[in-house]
Amino acid sequence: MSRVSIKTRDDLPEALRPLWDKMTTYGAFENQAGVMAHRAPIFKHMWSLLVDLASDGIISKRHLELALVTVSLLNKCDYCVSHHAPKLAVQGVSEEGAARLVDYKDHPELDELDKLVVEYSIAVTNNWNRTRDEIFARLRAHFSEAQIVELTWRIALCGAFNRFNDILQLEVEQGVPHSEAAE
């Protein structure tokens, strides 16, 4: 049970209700949005950013979901794994494959670029202060600087969402298949 109450669309100021409607096209994140709705600036800016990035993203959906699931596995966030593993399945990585992303080096469902995205997600999450230039040279071979910025931001933001969701004990919405992130 969530540690704070979950607000609904009707609890938002009228001006933010269209953003709630757009948010629901991103996925079944009503519990997360409902908690953020306690502070209109948090709801407004986080969901505006996510909706904008979804409509104008420059990272492939596959690479984005690889990054988000990897970070969520590392941080053991059941909420985020439950929401993003199905999106990764749409991109061709099985449920079993998603569960073992952190063991990426010999992962049969990942190509070399996929493995680089997972490796970078681990670096941003666990080794941000010890990451060397070598990985950036490999990233630059495949991604523009704008893409590297977006990928890095999405990885870091996912870590913040993992902590937010877990500390407030957000439950996975009804109808979303529950996935365990714990090893």
Model regions: which residues?
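Hydrophobic alpha-helical segments
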Residues: 1-183
